Amino acid sequence: MINVMLADDHVLIREGIKQLLEFDGSMKVIAEASDGIECLEKLKNVKPDILLLDINMPNMNGIDVLKELKEKNDPLKVLILTVHSEVEYLVKAVDIGANGYILKDSGSTELKQAINAVIDEGSYI
């Protein structure tokens, strides 16, 4: 089973992604965060296999979360959740060290393929 942490400021998006991931029992969302600060705090106590990270969040955005993780040499794999209008941030996130990205409106098959690719191969770009 793949343990996932989900960081997104929209509760409905988190709930939808959680349902998609947990439907067949192959993945489990073990922690959720609504902003970057909460994400970093929760990561002190949970060890997911992968972090699904939104870019645009209040208090601390996903880019800053990613920077902090990489500065600490954290080996956590990170898959960026994005919308079409965030291309410039997406490029920056990959340059900083994100393992890949996926559009928020992707279906469950594509989302699971992206997560599995990051876990198994180290990237989904």
Model-found features: residue ranges?
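Acidic catalytic/metal-coordinating carboxylates
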Residues: 35-38, 59-64
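Short amphipathic alpha-helix used as the core "switch/output" element in two-component signaling
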Residues: 41, 63-74
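The short loop immediately C-terminal to the conserved phospho-acceptor aspartate in CheY-like receiver
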Residues: 49, 55-56
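C-terminal output helix
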Residues: 86, 106-119, 123
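Active-site residues of response regulator receiver
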Residues: 8, 54, 82
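Acidic, metal-coordinating helix/loop segments flanking the phosphotransfer/catalytic sites
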Residues: 32-50
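The feature encodes the CheY-like receiver
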Residues: 13, 58
